[in-house]
Amino acid sequence: MSKTIDYEKIPGHWLLASLGKTVLRPGGLNLTKKMLDQLNITKDDHVVEFAPGLGVTARLTLQHDPHYTAIEQNEDAANKVRSYLTGSRQQCHIGTAEKTGLPDNSATIVYGEAMLTMQSAKQKQQIIAEAKRILKPGGKYAIHEMCLAPENIDNALKESIQKDLSVAIRVNARPLTIAEWKQVLEEEGFIVTEVKTAPMHLLRPKRMIQDEGLPGVIKIASKVICNPKARKRVLKMRAQFTKYEQYIQGVTMVAQLPEK
């Protein structure tokens, strides 16, 4: 596999996945679980997940046996998702978070993680608008993203963080403050009901053990040690996360549409 990966250009999340990391969300598995707890998913829900990827959150959701629809961008990604889906109540469609192809008012819960942070302001709005379109009145939309702190963070510092993170992870990173995240949701008619944060410790040993377990961390570490090019990229990412750790966090928000 290492022969086919350009370690200099591959997006950071796929680099980490190639090394065996399964939890790639900014607030870690614990914050994901808090998000799901607030959603209170039951077998009567119709759940839509944008870009489930490796499926860590999807598997937690499926424990509650809801109607479940994943949205993935291409057939290769969709087939990976379908490998852990079972039964007629679980499916994966080809589409994007901006254009799912799903009917209006067809879901009771929609969520996406580590997605909006990487989008422009216009794309953020389009994705949130699509979540609104496919949700039934009273439906819930949850996000798990990266946020900036404090609320009055200096604009020059914000730009430096966005630039340095984008260079390190090879994907445009446009995190917002908590107030800004709430604003983009409220502009589409959502009412934010829950906000929870966690430190952005994605590559810290303690968080990695919490997320991956000790055997998983040992396996990841051995791959990093044996792959100089991958190690160089991982260390660059970790250096930027550490440099700005007092200004970046993981955040999850649950927002609800009004009942009609």
Per-segment meaning from a language model:
Residues 194-260:
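Conserved Class I S-adenosyl-L-methionine
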Residues 25-43:
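Conserved alpha-helix/loop element of class I SAM-dependent methyltransferases that forms part
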Residues 98-110:
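A short acidic, Gly/Pro-enriched loop at the edge of an enzyme's catalytic core
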Residues 52-99:
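Class I SAM-dependent methyltransferase SAM/SAH-binding core
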